[in-house]
Amino acid sequence: MPSPAPPTELLPWERAVVLLSCALSALGSGLLVATHALWPDLRSRARRLLLFLSLADLLSAASYFYGVLQDFAGTSWDCVLQGALSTFANTSSFFWTVAIALYLYLSIVRTTRGPSTDHLIWAFHLISWGVPLAITVAAVSLKKIGYDASDVSVGWCWINLEAEDRVLWMLLTGKLWEMLAYILLPLLYLLVRKHINRAHQALSEYRPICEGRQLQRGSSTSTADKKLVLIPLIFICLRVWSTVRFVLTLCGSPAVQTPVLVVLHGIGNTFQGGANCIMFVLCTRAVRTRLFSLCCCCPRPSTQSPPGAPTPPKIGESQESRRTPEVPST
């Protein structure tokens, strides 16, 4: 790797844009966590995985916010702490994103259910929290985390550019898993979509025969489950700018300091939680309706009942009785 270039200077407007992205991502991740806590009938396995991804994104956005706000000029104790937190959260986010894609593949294509799915989720926890934690502890112990001159970040601390083996540690603390995700996520996504298309074709051929229970069973892949397929696409669109700047840094190109790339990198690394919130809260009718009713303090519209009639069941109760197990809300 060539000698480190002069530090990338962050302009005030660039810092403001990235700070706004961090704040929106933290707010979005917080909303996803809140909806999971408020409405138990929406707690399917798929949304539980989304909850863990949101927790990682929330920690990531908070640590990035502090780093961009401080705009470190050298390695300090808070630089190392911020770099460690963001490294752990960011790497964990990579693992949870792949875990969601793998869950979709196994549950939709392989129709994995029951105890085997529970064991799979425990394995997701062990890998998605344990591996990033081990890598982060090793990086901190060996003093690899520190000031990076914003050439592979946007104001926050990551791998110290003065470390001789900095490329190896950049790969271990994020880039290796990011690049593997670029391969695994589209592959799993294509397999899931191929299976869904085949299922739709089969249903269209036999629709006159199987309109009852089999048709309902075929619709167990709910709209929310299909929306989870978009997570890999969002991941790639957001993260690719970070990879571009990493490659430019390896090549010693001055283009790494291009303002547009810097801003796209800053937004891409920090806005995952906001993007997930848009898709799974604001664009999900069941969640959006409840959230707006809660914010506006307005009861959900219902038909008028005569005096003395039994009170209609609450939202959670009515949907709980109709809800198919393990199918996220739409």
Swiss-Prot record:
UniProt name for this protein: G-protein coupled receptor 157
Annotated spans, Disordered: 301-330
Membrane topology field: Multi-pass membrane protein
Basic and acidic residues: bias regions: 317-330
Phosphoprotein in keyword set: no
Membrane-crossing residue ranges in chain numbering: 16-36, 49-69, 88-108, 120-140, 167-187, 228-248, 260-280
GO BP terms: cell surface receptor signaling pathway; circadian behavior; phospholipase C-activating G protein-coupled receptor signaling pathway; radial glial cell differentiation
Tissues and organs where the protein is expressed, per its UniProt entry: Expressed in the primary cilia of radial glial progenitors (RGPs) in the developing neocortex.
Residue ranges annotated as Cytoplasmic topological domain: 37-48, 109-119, 188-227, 281-330
GO function terms (MF aspect): G protein-coupled receptor activity
Main location: membrane
Recorded family membership: Belongs to the G-protein coupled receptor 2 family.
Keywords, in A-Z order: Cell membrane, Cell projection, Developmental protein, Differentiation, G-protein coupled receptor, Membrane, Receptor, Transducer, Transmembrane, Transmembrane helix
Function (record text): Orphan receptor that promotes neuronal differentiation of radial glial progenitors (RGPs). The activity of this receptor is mediated by a G(q)-protein that activates a phosphatidylinositol-calcium second messenger.
Compartments it resides in: Cell projection, Cilium membrane
Topological domains annotated Extracellular: 1-15, 70-87, 141-166, 249-259
GO cellular component: ciliary membrane
